[in-house]
Amino acid sequence: MSVMASDKACAPVRASRPFPKQKLRELVLQALYALEIDPEGEDSLVSLLMTEASVSKKNAAYALMFCRAIRANQPDLDALLDATIRTTTLARLTIIERNILRMMLFEHQQNQDCCPVPVAILIAETTRLIKKFSYSEGSSLILAVLGSIFDHPAPALDAPLEPTSMCG
């Protein structure tokens, strides 16, 4: 049976696939890294993410929205991290390690009310991001810090993200 051209025009259009959370976390981490290196570079960040990570403008802008929210809460996040880290200081960690901690802590705190992400998923994602962007030796400290924080109720953030959050 042959399909006529007019039949193809009536075929249902597939909705685009949702942006995977793993990819979103990678983009947010890369954006946080870029802004820590060049704090004035936010204007060119969307185009940089589009080019380097091969993502749409919409997804790059979405990642930048999370990056801005994390940076808005950075003093509170860093204070909690500084109070938890015992063997070193937050400043002595690599840029990637600091930003992985900030991002995962933010996601944990941000999503408590709407759709909490299980701690096991956050720990697994932390491990994956460390393996991909850092070195495995640093993972034990990062995981210990997050584990210690996740064992206690999450404090409220001053500048929460819009209701869309990372819930999708």
Swiss-Prot record:
Keyword check for Transcription regulation: yes
Example GO BP: DNA-templated transcription termination
InterPro entries, per database record: NusB-like_sf, NusB_fam, NusB_RsmB_TIM44
Keyword NADP belongs to the record: no
MF (Gene Ontology): RNA binding
Keywords for this protein: RNA-binding, Transcription, Transcription antitermination, Transcription regulation
GO CC field: cytosol
PANTHER family per record: ANTITERMINATION NUSB DOMAIN-CONTAINING PROTEIN (PTHR11078:SF3), N UTILIZATION SUBSTANCE PROTEIN B-RELATED (PTHR11078)
Function according to Swiss-Prot or TrEMBL: Involved in transcription antitermination. Required for transcription of ribosomal RNA (rRNA) genes. Binds specifically to the boxA antiterminator sequence of the ribosomal RNA (rrn) operons.
Family: Belongs to the NusB family.
Protein name: Transcription antitermination protein NusB
Organism: Chlamydia trachomatis serovar A (strain ATCC VR-571B / DSM 19440 / HAR-13)
Gene behind this protein: nusB
